[in-house]
Amino acid sequence: MEINKFICSQGPKKNSCEDFWRMVLEQESCIIVSLTETDDEDQVCYEYWVKEEDYELAFGRYVVKTLEIIEESSFTRTRLRLTDVSSDTSREIHHFWYPHWSDYGNPTNPAEILNLISKVNQKRKEMKKTADSQPGPIVVHCSAGIGRTGTFCTIDNALSQLRKEQTVCLPQTVLKIQKSKI
């Protein structure tokens, strides 16, 4: 199990988007996985990025610009530019959005989740090879930050363990995750 691979978070609300982006920048995260719908009423998760290319949103001192949107078969991958205007620092963020997993539900197609996990890990591996420094933790969120988020991280860890050891014990995997606070 890779320690500090993930930051598990609730979906940002309108009043916490600036804090969310501050965390992403401070933790040097370059990948975000969103496992929830967004809504304008701010009940589930506020729309903290623009779903159209070449548009931007400002949250306090942070500006988020959408550079590219790539529609995959079951999720949307978006390249964003996050800029802290007070320090003029910026970072490219890869955002993976999978809104088809309902709260308190199961994924309708487990192969889609496995594909999403594979693509996220592929992007992280690619970034580790090309970056001057190691990318920070992957930020994973749903609405509350526990159910779908925890399941995503558990599946990722179980798959990693299965590849390395040819066996997996889910209860032990969950306990390790809880103890390490990945």
UniProtKB/Swiss-Prot annotation:
Do you know which Pfam families this protein is assigned to? Y_phosphatase
As recorded in UniProt, its EC number(s) are 3.1.3.48
Cite the GO molecular-function annotations of the record. protein tyrosine phosphatase activity
Q: Which residues form the signal peptide?
A: none
EC supergroup of this enzyme? hydrolase
Q: Please report the stretch or stretches of sequence annotated as the Tyrosine-protein phosphatase domain.
A: 1-182
Q: Mind telling me which InterPro entries this protein's record contains?
A: Prot-tyrosine_phosphatase-like, Protein-Tyr_Phosphatase, PTP_cat, Tyr_Pase_AS, Tyr_Pase_cat, Tyr_Pase_dom
Q: Which UniProt keywords apply?
A: Hydrolase, Protein phosphatase
Q: Which reaction does it catalyse?
A: O-phospho-L-tyrosyl-[protein] + H2O = L-tyrosyl-[protein] + phosphate
- Quote the catalytic residue positions: C142 (phosphocysteine intermediate)
Gene3D superfamilies for this protein: Protein tyrosine phosphatase superfamily
Sequence similarity: Belongs to the protein-tyrosine phosphatase family.
Protein name as annotated: Probable tyrosine phosphatase protein H4
Q: Which organism is it from?
A: Microplitis demolitor bracovirus (isolate Webb)
